[in-house]
């Protein structure tokens, strides 16, 4: 599938202007959500003088401006068919570069996500068209109740065909006739055989695919974690083994002043005010492979997490990235704190 230029706005996205004889430079940013046209006037205009007569290079980090147009206030909504991704979870960016303030050098269009690159990838990394690694194998919880089970985001260039292929060779297809950012569902009817399903996107002669394999759990309540991953998209992860919920309360204790010496022995002389509590949950992944460390790492680095549909923050701050050569059986335990007081105090 042809690559589309993208911006990962949690990492710096550097625009560089270094032209002979320039004394200043300018960047115009046009930022908008959805599939409509670019704004008629720049959303932001940035300019600066060159550092010196011998150092003409000027650089701009546009990521902070882009992030203002992306939010994940709306949880992932699953559908049986391929549908457009919520327009607030990505945006379009047009960048115009100018020598001095009037000489237009070029105009470049991007699709921006709230993703990031690792240090080893260098600056302005390209993370691909998928919100999961291309040609990878992903695992999901199949309870035979939820249809669909999960989804992933993809930038699809039309015309393309999304193909769900079961292990027995049977397929379902959906034709995409409009270029855009889509959520691709993992449909449980195809996965019920227990051998998983491969989702492929075919464009001309290019085929990209991700395999999804179901896992069943009979003993424990499976905990679902929704988080925004490194690609700037919602991703689901399931923790299959024992989980523990803990409540911690806080309050302010005072000594009471008795109104008279004949005090009420049923009242006591100390009282707690403004009592409230928070809840944490510890979850266990169950036995996983070495490469699951990447998913755990992205959960730890996520700024938006839901635990069984409720907003939460990561309480685990560090853990060992395990390897089967050292630890034959790998299990990850994470702790989350729900991001609200147990007694509602929101005004």
Predicted segments with their positions:
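Preference for solvent-exposed, low-hydrophobicity sequence contexts
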Residues: 1-218
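Extracellular/virion structural assembly segments
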Residues: 2-4, 8-12, 20-22, 155, ...
């Amino acid at each position: 599938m042809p690559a589309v230029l993208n911006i990962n706005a949690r990492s710096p996205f550097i625009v560089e202007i270094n032209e002979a004889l320039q004394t200043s430079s300018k960047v115009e940013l046009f930022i908008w959500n959805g599939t409509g046209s670019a704004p008629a006037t720049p959303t932001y205009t940035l300019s600066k003088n060159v550092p010196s007569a011998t150092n003409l290079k000027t650089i701009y980090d546009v990521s902070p401006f882009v992030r203002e147009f992306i939010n994940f206030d709306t949880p992932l909504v699953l559908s049986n068919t391929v549908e457009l991704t919520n327009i607030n979870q990505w945006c379009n960016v047009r960048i115009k570069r100018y020598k001095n303030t009037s000489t237009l050098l070029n105009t470049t269009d991007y699709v921006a996500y709230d993703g990031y690159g690792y240090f080893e990838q260098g600056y302005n990394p390209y993370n691909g068209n998928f919100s999961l690694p291309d040609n990878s194998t992903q695992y999901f919880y199949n309870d035979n109740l939820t249809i669909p089970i999960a989804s992933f985001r993809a930038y699809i260039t039309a015309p393309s065909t999304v193909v769900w292929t079961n292990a027995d060779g049977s397929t379902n297809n959906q034709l995409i006739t409009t270029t855009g950012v889509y959520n691709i569902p993992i449909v449980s009817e195809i996965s019920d055989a227990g051998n998983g399903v491969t989702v492929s996107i075919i464009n001309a002669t290019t085929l990209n695919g991700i395999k999804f394999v179901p896992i069943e759990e009979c003993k424990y309540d499976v905990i679902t974690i929704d988080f925004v991953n490194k690609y700037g998209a919602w991703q689901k992860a399931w923790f299959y083994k024992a989980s523990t919920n803990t409540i911690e309360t806080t309050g302010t204790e005072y000594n009471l002043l008795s109104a008279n010496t004949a005090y009420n022995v049923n009242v006591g002389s100390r009282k707690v005010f403004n009592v409230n509590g928070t809840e944490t949950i510890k979850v266990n992944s169950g036995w996983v492979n070495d490469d699951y460390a990447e998913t755990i790492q992205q959960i730890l680095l996520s700024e938006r997490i839901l635990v069984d549909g409720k907003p939460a923050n990561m309480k685990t701050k560090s853990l060992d990235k395990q390897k089967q050569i050292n630890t034959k059986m790998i299990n990850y335990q994470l702790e989350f704190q729900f991001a609200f007081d147990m007694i509602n105090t929101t005004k």
